[in-house]
């Protein structure tokens, strides 16, 4: 029977590189998803343990759910989820969590988002984007000066009514389901925070480009709708790109076609899918790290609290992420010299390449 200490030692050794007794062929076999054959002779990939983040640069026209399904299939991952829906109309950052990274999704969802979006003036639509039908029109067009004067009204903590076509729940049903059935249900305003809102371009009177950085729960479509109403000309989103989600910015994003190409190279033994993964702890960017000994790690791994007192006691409290020999072990609460594990990570399987471990 494997002891907790042996289990910890095993997990630590996984993070220190490939087993010296393992051949390159073995590595390539692991990098490429395993395959079996169905009765109809079509290949079937075995599900496997994959842990990390894929900062997908989602293309226009794909839903967030579809994107998760594609990434999950490419990695043959057992578990996957995303950290914040991105409309089909939109492109850009959709962080997808695989395996144990799904335990850190809330930390990303609570982070800031940054968008670059274009508003088409003169028409309000029921979806607040180009996919809907017009519900109000105007021949008026705003000047850059009028727009600039309006921006402070939408900066800071404000109240915002979500779009009719949104995932907000009303008596257990999604607002977009009710809207598709023809029901117009009044939605209550919600507090949101917009940290920055800038007019980036206003080359013609019919369209304006904005950049916004906002907190959790903000709807950019609602922002365009409300600006159009206050300007007296109506408006809707005609282009939208998310450029930041928590710790994931455009420099870390990978286009879907690049991910597919990497998957193809890995299948032929010429690439490593781990190169597309970011470490699980990337999502814990704003949380302090705390290194512990192997003995303490073994206790935490069993779900037991650890006392950290005396001269070497850490001078901090609250939520921390715990590491042992540089390897993520757990999320824990630290207070009064006691470290209590809340989420323990089991990172056996495919993880981010060493050069992406920070």
Curated annotation (Swiss-Prot):
Catalytic activity: uridine(55) in tRNA = pseudouridine(55) in tRNA
HAMAP family named among the record's database cross-references: TruB_bact
EC number: 5.4.99.25
Entry keyword tRNA-binding: no
Family as reported in the entry's similarity comment: Belongs to the pseudouridine synthase TruB family. Type 1 subfamily.
Full protein name: tRNA pseudouridine synthase B
Function: Responsible for synthesis of pseudouridine from uracil-55 in the psi GC loop of transfer RNAs.
